[in-house]
Amino acid sequence: MSNLEVRPAPSLCGGTGRTGPVRDVQPGKQVPLGESTVVRRLLPNLGRRMVGAWCFVDHYGPDDIVDEPGMQVPPHPHLGLQTVSWLREGEVLHRDSLGSLQTVRPRELGLMTSGRAIAHSEESPHGHGPFLHGAQLWVALPGAHRDTAPSFEHHTDLPVINGGGLSATVILGELAGATSPGTTYSPLVGADLTLTAGTDTRLPLDPDFEYAALTISGESEVDGVRLAPGTLLYLGCGRGELPLRADADSSLLLLGGEPFEEQIVMWWNFIGRSQQDIEDARTDWTTGSRFGTVHGYDGDRLAAPELPPVALKPRGRVR
């Protein structure tokens, strides 16, 4: 998925700074995605740019797309990151410049590693179902791996942890001894948590990780905080477990990882280490080099926005 903001602001994030356990509720914002989809952007937000290596989170739906085209994101580039496609309802057709062609369905992991450069498109396939509901997330690649070869993975058999009214699907990384088959380049976790009505349980966590949670359906209570869709709850580090409650059926995404100590520059769909990295990537996309071609998409590719006239300034992990 692309960041389709007309004037995406460059930002430098990461760097040192650990916190103990906190409960910081941070609102997201509504962002149009293509012609027919509006997403809730929860990361980066007004208070925080990263949670571990997680640096971008869009939650969309559930949307009724019976008489709509659904998701239509033309070919666009990525650099220095991984994209994680996660669906609750519907399906998304992924194409990329490696030649991958894959339909991603609910509770299947679509994991694309851009490494040094890749381009892809995402669209609701012809004859798509009535609803679309899911999340698109990005993971920043550490400096040692940012020039790795691009790849795409599709995993349909993900580990699930069940108990106490909680069902946790490990999307990426490791949680409570269960490990996703998706490739990772830094210690992290992404999990889909389903809570049945009456759930009152505690989920084991890694105290070295920082965590955040966001509700994707219903309303639940996370460490005593009532959490509805549209907000992100930053939980900090130093937690050995996480209290979870639900009066009605609900679901959450849990994101975590070791605090990302490197400083990164993120603009549009690129992650680099300097403004020059970003400028070079934009030039290469505009001139048709480095990122390759997405074959089979019926339409034009996305044009890169204009770079802002300001120099990048260090901002740290929080704004």
Tell me what each language-model feature is.
Residues 1-319:
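Jelly-roll (double-stranded beta-helix
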